[in-house]
Amino acid sequence: MRSLIKKEIQDMHDEICCHMDKLHSNKVFIYPFNDESIEFKKKLDKIFNVNANFICDEEKDFKTSASNIVLFDEIVSHKDKSEFTIFLSNSDNDLWCIDFWKFENAGIPCENIINFKQFDYYCNLINNKIDYMEEHIKSLSLLSNDDKKTSSAYKTLDSLDKCGNVYNLLYDEISKKVYLRLIAKKIMRCKFYFDIYSPDQYFVDSIINLSPNEVFVDAGAYDGDTINKFIKLCKNKYKHIYAFEPDNSAFKNLVINAQSYDNISFVNAGLHNEAVTVKFENAIFGSSHIKSNDSNNCMQFVDKLFIKGDVLNLTPTFIKMDIEGSELAALNGFSNTIESFKPSLAICIYHKPEDIWEIPLCINNMNNNYKIFIRHHTYSDTETVCYAVN
């Protein structure tokens, strides 16, 4: 497994060098036009001897000489868009993603769309040797999204062996490629994932086949966004939906948004491997979670009931989980149900570093006939999902 990961890191390094080389052969543009763009243009010119122009949406946005400005419509109408490299100056992650989609939908190859932070990362990477990552590969000290390392219990060669076991379980070549690249990116501290992005989170049509008899368990239903998508894909033909959401504020919105649907049960509780009352943070933006041992801010936490899935006697055909790091415990709480009914699974594996090997192995232990897939569903380092279908 180590040799596969090292090769993936080398491949990633080579691809980045190739992207950087294109700066001298491609036409380079910066979008949107703002103060950061002006400073970045100076940097490209001074350090890399690259002359860049600005892109504006409309002529009224012009703030400099017209010779430096290209309208967005001109980019869209250009025949060979692979000749373009687009730099995005918005630092806000949501705005950056919107701009990324805008140019990707216009036909610019995704590898030719780079934001400023990504460019800085590329520069640092190609200016340093990659051999120094060997120690990280040995220990597999991956980082989670908040830059917390794996617990010391996982910093062993055993973790590398477990990743190898997961790799060998994966059903298709796409999953194997995504899995290796995920590990390589985490080891290399890379937070840009456009190269392994897949659309249709939880409902990848080549993996998940929905029927009119679905019993859908949505663990971490938030405000009903996934349920809305499920019902649309089912064309409103399903058997029942069970929506679990422990966050009080999100639960209220969930009921408001989904109460008009038929055959749906709302549960204002979380899922775990046992019935337990825990300290729970009602956070914003869908990131509510159980209090961790190292949390110092007790004022944010409230007592909340978490239940064991097996005691509910459900007969699910499809279980989705996005529950902020409690996925493994919730899976174990549903173990008898999963072993008995073999539902399709879509389980997030990005909240804790060890999830990328512990959760697939847990699923395989419950049913070794499952076909296991891995897909990644954002341009950043969140929303990695393990799928299992019987």
For the regions a protein language model found, what residue spans apply to each?
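Phosphate/nucleotide-binding beta-alpha loop and adjacent structural elements of enzyme active sites
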Residues: 1-29, 35-48, 60-85, 89-390
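Short beta-strand "acidic-cap" motif of Rossmann-like dinucleotide-binding folds
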Residues: 54-55, 243
